[in-house]
Amino acid sequence: MSRYVIERNLPEGLSDGDVDAAVRRTVAVNADLPTVTWIGSHLATDHRKFFCIYEAPGPEVIRKAARLAEIPCDVVTEVRPVDPESYADSQL
């Protein structure tokens, strides 16, 4: 499985209730798509953008999940994890 960052541009004036409803739809859709794993997301404080981390066999299944959940899927970028633990034993 590959890992992806998804950038979702959200409409202005989105409420917390709107965000909660979108998250519930996403969870329901992903339950029916076993090849898609939602790792987590970060919501911009102005509620205008979501940055989501997914594992999937390819970007097309991520876009399909977004369509089914009726949420935006503006940019899908394949990434590789880089974290502090990966470098804990290295010499600086």
Say what each PLM segment does.
Residues 35-41, 75:
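A short linear hydrophobic-aromatic micro-motif
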Residues 26, 30, 34, 56, ...:
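Generic helix-packing signal
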Residues 50-53, 74-76, 85-92:
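Short amphipathic alpha-helical patches
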Residues 56-82:
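An amphipathic, aromatic/His-enriched active-site/gating alpha helix that lines ligand/cofactor pockets
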Residues 4-8, 39-65:
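Short, well-ordered beta-strand segments in beta-rich or mixed alpha/beta enzyme
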Residues 1-32, 44, 81-92:
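Short S/T/G/P-rich N-terminal loop/turn motif that feeds into the first structured element of a domain
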